[in-house]
Each structure stands twice: as structure tokens, then as C-alpha cells.
Amino acid sequence: MESLRIYNTLARDKQVFVPRQPGEVRMYVCGITVYDYCHVGHARMLVVFDLVQRWLRAIGYRVTYVRNITDIDDKIIRRAVENGETIKSLTDRFIGAMHEDETALGIQRPDVEPRATQFIPQMLGMIETLETNGYAYQAADGDVNYSVRKFADYGKLSGKSLDDLRAGERVAANDAKQDPLDFVLWKRAKEDEPEGASWASKYGMGRPGWHIECSAMGCSLLGNHFDIHGGGQDLQFPHHENEIAQSEGATGETFVNYWMHNGFVQVDNEKMSKSLGNFFTIREVLERYDAEVVRFFIVRTHYRSPLNYSDVHLDDARASLTRLYTALKDVEPDTLALDWNEPHGQRFAAAMNDDFNTPVAVATLFELAGEVNRTRDASLARQLKQLAGLLGLLGREPRAFLQQASGAAQAGGLAADEIEAQIAARVAAKQAKDYAEADRIRAELLEAGIALEDKPGGSTEWRRV
């Protein structure tokens, strides 16, 4: 099997992956700020790094996968106040909702899922170290800030030059800062903030800045220097750039070897975001589409490419996934172990080892499905299920998928018992030699999105189309 190559944002190139400890991978991914329901952009991040950790384990690595939860933030505080509830009540509720969405999408839970509020002492310890090392200062307004110009390598991840950056590029100007580009490590508490929004420190009551949270959690759980750090493309600057400055400024060590960033989800060629008001929650999408269809929609696009969201693309994903399940419908796979020396296994592995090239891996699944359709071979069916399973797909009994209605069909389509009644009426018509009536029922069901297949022996199977 070829070596795994990962596109490293830091190097701006694909690189052969070499873990710091042979056979072990330590990976941190920036998770979700829990003040609302997860949207499709979140779904992409969740699925992408679920695929990454699945593949790393599949090729033999022992993986420690950490994905954090941001459970203290200005947006969280505002939403809790608006709702008249405590911060913990709000965040617990949306963490629960996030877990429900993950389960629906077939996301395997990370090995560790730290909440920012569980690591306040570690954050304060890192801030004090940065102050000791000359990278941090307490401003007149009580905030503790990071002095960006003190860190010589600032900009190495994003490629941005300090001289080219201006206050306002995702950085709020503040007269209390020594430099407009400096960013906050510890926010001084305001008098009107609710309970649970601040902690005691040598700097006064306050709460951590967003960036220090991930530095402290990553270093605490994975060590000062670890293998992979991931997140959405929008986090490359300033969040991940600032993480590097904080972590390396505090420890004096390289923070991360490989930086991975997934591309945006787009609607009408614009980034899907709450600020633009063009986002859809996972729950809204799952009302209309099967969760595995949504996962397949995400999986079949390379993780670094833009993902264009539309009903047309989701409908196409549903049709494509239906083709894969249909290939398995009447074939019982054998129970042999996956053999990477088989040609399809080799092509699949080569694709996944080429920076997780899921479009090519999915194409291999369709090649296999075509061969299964032609040969009805149990070995090929087993390979199809096994390889698809590495992507979190084709885990259901084929008929269960093919007969399951989408959310839209559940709202206005035929229920299974209604379909069976129509099939029984068609059987009766055929027995009475009323073939015109039998054809009418078949056509009526097809119009309603139900395809019939007459089997040897007189039985009839159905699936949704």
C-alpha cells in the first residue's frame, strides 16, 4: 500500500505523513460553538474529520482524536441572556442536539471531547507563561493581549505579512492594545454579565479569548507538539495562526506538523454562513433527506474543494446512493476479511492515501457496483460493503434503505402499508387477467415514486425512486 500523503496548509503542498511516534497519531480538530443548532457547514467539518480518523485507523494507526466544544463565548452569553436561561443550560441543550445530529450522520465520537470551561486553569497557566516569556501584556482596560509583533513567525500558516495586515481584517481595533493586530487572551469581565460568564484570575475576573482555548486544550491533551490539527478553511486565519503564536510562544516547541482545512459549503457560489442568512441547519435538511444521503453528498466531494449545496445535488446524491444499495439488494456478501491486494481495494486505498481523495474512492465503489450487477458475485458484494463501510456508507440492509421514505416523502408520500395494499390489488387484478388495471396500478405507484419489480415465483418487491 502506498504511503499516506496529506495536503499540509503550512507547507502549501502534499506531504508524506510521518507521525511523531511510529504507529500513533494525535489529532486535534476545532469543534463547534454551541449556541444554536448545527448547520450544513458544521456537518461538513464533522464528516470530513470523521473520514480522516476512520481511514487512519483502517490503515493501522492508533489514533487519539480530540475535538473540542466551545462552551463560553460572547455569542453564547448573548443568546443565554436573550433566552432568559443560564449559560450551562443553553450549552448543554445544544451539545445534546449536536450529538443527535452526529449520530444521525454516522459520525463516530472523538476519543476526547473537551469543553473549554473544563480547562480554565490550563488556559490561565499558558497566559501566565506567555506573559513571562514577553508575549503577553495586560492592557489599561484589564484585558490580557498577545503582542503579535513579538512572535517572529506570525503569518507562516496563512501567508499573511504583518505589514500587510490592517486593523479590521477579522480583528477589532481597540485603543487599549499596543498594536491593533494584537489579540485578546483573557477578557476582563463586564459588570452586567450573567453568572457563569467569568472566572477569578490574577488579572481579575474574566474569561478566556477564543484562541487560547484551543491552544491550552490541544497541548494539555496531546502534548506541546502533535501530528495533525484540523478545522474549517475559515479558521486558518486568524484562529489557527493565533494558536501557533500562542502555543509556540509558550512552549518554545513546534506546535503541529500537519494542518488540514476543509473547504466551504456554498449556496449560489457564496459561502454558507449565519451572517449571510443563507444557511440550513442539519435538522432542516434531515426533514427532507435521509441522513446517509446527506453524508454521501458530503463524502463524494474532495474535502478541500467547495461543496455546492442545493436540492439538485442532494437529489443526485440520493439517486447515486440508491444505485449502490440496489447493487447489493439480491446478493448475500461473503464473510471474508478485506484484502487490500484485490484490485478494487488497491485503487480505493491509493485514492484515500492521496490526501483522502474521496471522489476517486467513491468512483471505485461504483465500479464495484457495476460488476456486482453483472456477476452477482458474493465476493465483490463483500468488497463493496467493506470499502463503503470505511466511508461510513452502505451499513444498512439494502431493502431497508430502498423502501425508506425521505423526509419529504414521509410528509406527503405513500406509507409502506398503503404501497403493500396497492401491490395486493395489482396481484388480484393480474389473477383476474385484468392486465390493464394491473398496469394502471404500476403506473400510479411509479408516479408516486414507487418502482415495482416482479420476482420469479410471483412475488413483487418495491423501492422508492
Swiss-Prot record:
Classification via CDD domains: Anticodon_Ia_Cys, CysRS_core
Q: Signal peptide: which range, if any?
A: none
Q: What class of enzyme is it?
A: ligase
Answer whether the UniProt record assigns the keyword Zinc to this protein: yes
As to how many cofactors bind and how, the note says: Binds 1 zinc ion per subunit.
Report the EC code(s) recorded for this entry.
6.1.1.16
- What are the record keywords, sorted? Aminoacyl-tRNA synthetase, ATP-binding, Cytoplasm, Ligase, Metal-binding, Nucleotide-binding, Protein biosynthesis, Zinc
Place the motif 'HIGH' region on the sequence. 32-42
Sequence positions that bind ATP: K274
Gene Ontology cellular-component terms listed: cytosol
What InterPro entries does this protein's entry cite?
Answer: Cys-tRNA-ligase (IPR015803), Cys-tRNA-synt_Ia_DALR (IPR015273), Cys-tRNA/MSH_ligase (IPR024909), CysS_C (IPR056411), Rossmann-like_a/b/a_fold (IPR014729), tRNA-synt_1_cat_dom (IPR032678), tRNAsynth_Ia_anticodon-bd (IPR009080)
Family matches, as Pfam families: CysS_C, DALR_2, tRNA-synt_1e
Q: Does the keyword Ligase apply?
A: yes
Cofactor needs: Zn(2+)
* MF-aspect GO terms: ATP binding; cysteine-tRNA ligase activity; zinc ion binding
Which SMART domains does the entry link to?
Answer: DALR_2
- Fill in the subunit field for this protein: Monomer.
- The name under which this protein is listed is Cysteine--tRNA ligase
Record the organism: Burkholderia orbicola (strain MC0-3)
Q: Which gene encodes it?
A: cysS
